Design a protein with these regions (language model features):
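Short pocket-lining segment of the protein kinase catalytic domain that shapes the ATP-binding cleft
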Residues: 105-113
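An alpha-helical support segment within catalytic cores of ATP-dependent transferases
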Residues: 23-38, 145-199, 203, 313-328
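A conserved alpha-helical element in kinase catalytic cores
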Residues: 63-105, 119-139
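Active-site activation/catalytic loop segments of kinase-like enzymes and analogous catalytic loops
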Residues: 227-258, 270-304
Length: 329
């Protein structure tokens, strides 16, 4: 089903529902109405992600978002969110169980503004939300869902072997084995530095309510190094060095020292993350959003220049990669 559906997305409008989608959504709607005890008065596709579809629905004049999993084998952190009901995530009102044919999660839409509607630079001092943002991260990072450091596992998931299938289109994938090896050499697992990490803190995943911040879309989440989550947020939220220093100024001194000890590892981690975003978007949707791809590819190039000396790259491959990056400037 997934392969058929993703192929058709190249030629259909993003919010178009396929007949097969209408069929499985009927069972999801029925389950939601049963759990909530109320009828759904409105239901429309909100956006499409490589591993799920998101729908906006209205129940008793209350807006809710429902995500339906399209890739059953891909980890998505939904179960962890539902079991723990974290305060930094919007209230979850309904979700599937292990016996349901289709996996879904349904949560309230808090009153507020997405960072994407606020500014390209939402952590700028003028918005006065730096402390609130860091407080939310601190709350999230304080939770451990297991006693494992999943940071290396996360990097490996960012850079799958299957990516070599698009080598001719995206030659950067030839670096992935070397990148994973370089990260293992530079990063030492330490459970004391771990907690729940979002690892996708971009503008579209953060809602500012005026009093606090809610985080959504935890598909990249893991029990991993929290300092790498902070370094990654610097890049995804377009923080200047000055703004970043202001934000981390709310950390305790020992935390700041540990943060900077992980800076070199963060360069490799961030490179892996942005390439993961490129892969999932391009392999699933092709060139549907070249503006988004350009941003991620330019970020990939930035971190490539920072880590290339750790990868021992042949000159011919280096030229091929640089030529590719040049085409996307």
């Amino acid at each position: 089903m997934e392969k058929q559906r993703n192929h058709l997305q190249f030629v259909r409008a993003e919010k178009t529902l396929l007949p097969i989608e209408e069929e499985f959504l009927a069972s999801v709607k029925k389950k939601i109405e049963s759990q909530l005890g109320s009828a759904i008065s409105k239901w429309e596709k909100y956006y499409t992600h490589p591993i799920y579809d998101c729908f906006l629905m209205i129940v008793n004049d209350r807006p809710l978002l429902t995500k339906v999993n399209l890739s059953p084998d891909a980890p998505n952190f939904w179960k962890e969110l539902c079991v723990n009901n974290f305060s930094f995530h919007p209230k979850i009102v309904c979700y599937s169980d292990d016996f349901d044919e289709f996996q879904f999660i349904c949560f309230e839409v808090p009153k507020g503004i997405f960072f994407s509607d606020l500014s390209n630079y939402p952590l700028s001092r003028k918005f006065n939300i730096q402390k609130t943002f860091l407080s939310t991260l601190d709350s999230m990072h304080s939770f451990k869902i297991n006693e494992n450091d999943e940071t290396i596992k996360t990097v490996e998931s960012f850079l799958p072997r299957e990516a070599m299938s698009i080598y001719k289109t995206y030659p950067v994938v030839a670096l992935f084995p070397a990148v994973k090896l370089a990260f293992k050499k530079i990063y030492t697992p330490q459970i004391n530095d771990c907690g729940v990490c979002h690892f996708d803190l971009c503008h579209q995943n953060i809602i500012y309510t005026g009093d606090d911040i809610k985080l959504i879309n935890f598909e990249y989440a893991a029990n991993a190094n929290t300092y790498l989550d902070i370094w990654l947020a610097k890049e995804t939220l377009n923080c200047s060095d000055t703004t970043f220093d202001e934000v981390v100024g709310y950390l305790k001194k020992p935390q700041v020292e540990t943060l900077y000890r992980h800076k070199d590892a963060s360069l490799i981690f961030n490179f892996a993350y942005f390439n993961s975003k490129i892969l999932s978007e391009y392999i699933t949707f092709g060139l549907r959003d070249p503006v988004k791809l350009k941003i991620w590819i330019n970020k990939s190039e930035f971190f490539y220049t920072k880590i290339q000396n750790k990868l021992f790259i042949e000159k011919s491959l280096d030229k091929l990669i640089r030529d590719f990056y040049y085409l996307w400037k």
